[in-house]
A protein has these predicted regions:
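Conserved donor nucleotide-binding strand/loop of the catalytic core
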Residues: 36-61, 65
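Catalytic-site signature of metal-activated, phosphate-bearing donor transferases
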Residues: 56-63, 69, 74, 80-166
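Short, well-formed alpha-helical segments that are part of the catalytic scaffolds
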Residues: 1-23
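Conserved beta-strand positions in the Rossmann-like core of class I SAM-dependent methyltransferases
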Residues: 25-28, 47
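A conserved acidic beta->alpha catalytic loop
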Residues: 16, 20, 28-40, 51, ...
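Alpha-helical solenoid scaffolds in eukaryotic macromolecular assemblies
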Residues: 4, 8-12, 30, 72, ...
Length: 166
C-alpha cells in the first residue's frame, strides 16, 4: 500500500489484513506524522518513495517490492472484514485466473445514491453506523510477476495492463 500521513487509519487497515497476507509492503511518500512509526511496529516492509505527483508510479514501486505469489492492494483508509478472510483465501487457492475482483463498499447515509444497498447485518461493525453502501467491483488481488502495472496519475487502475494480458 502507498501511504502519506495515514496515522489515523493505518493501524486499523494493517490489523484487518495481518492474518490474511504473508507480507505487507508499505510505501511512504513523505509522511510527517506517525505513519512510519506505526508501519515499523507492525513488522511491515517499509520503503520510502519520493512523491512524483503520480499515484501509479508509487503503486508500481510497491509492486516491485512484493515477493509473494499474489498481491492484494489496499489503501490505508480501507479494511477487509475478518469474516471475509476465509472466502478470500479460498478464492486465491482455487483461482484459475490471474486476477480476483472483490466488492469494495463505500459506506454512506445517502440512500438515494445509485446502487445503494442497505447494510447487511453481518457487517454492522464495518458500516460504523452508516445506513448502507454503494458497491464497486474492482480488481484487488492479482498474481505477482505477470506484468500488471498501474496506470493513471490519479485514480490509477490496472485496466490498460489487464487489456495487454488479454
Amino acid at each position: 500500500m502507498i501511504v502519506k500521513n495515514e496515522e489515523q487509519w493505518l493501524q486499523q487497515c494493517l490489523d484487518s489484513v495481518k492474518a490474511l497476507v504473508s507480507e505487507i509492503i508499505v510505501v511512504d511518500t513523505g509522511s510527517t506524522d506517525k505513519t512510519k512509526e506505526i508501519a515499523k511496529k507492525n513488522v511491515v516492509k517499509l520503503f520510502d518513495f519520493p512523491w512524483q505527483d503520480d499515484f501509479a508510479a508509487a503503486r508500481n514501486f510497491s509492486i516491485s517490492k512484493a515477493s509473494c505469489d499474489w498481491i492484494l492492494w489496499i489503501d490505508a483508509d480501507e479494511t477487509i472484514a475478518k469474516k471475509d478472510h476465509d472466502i478470500i483465501k479460498k478464492l486465491v487457492a482455487e483461482s484459475q485466473f490471474p486476477l480476483i475482483v472483490l466488492e469494495q463498499r463505500h459506506y454512506t447515509h445517502d440512500t438515494t445514491k445509485s446502487l445503494f444497498k442497505k447494510t447487511d447485518e453481518r457487517y454492522t461493525a464495518e458500516a460504523r453506523g452508516f445506513a448502507g453502501y454503494t458497491p464497486t467491483l474492482t480488481t484487488r488481488l492479482f498474481k505477482n510477476k505477470i506484468g500488471l502495472q498501474f496506470d493513471g496519475v490519479v485514480h490509477e487502475t490496472l485496466d490498460k495492463s489487464m487489456q495487454k494480458l488479454g
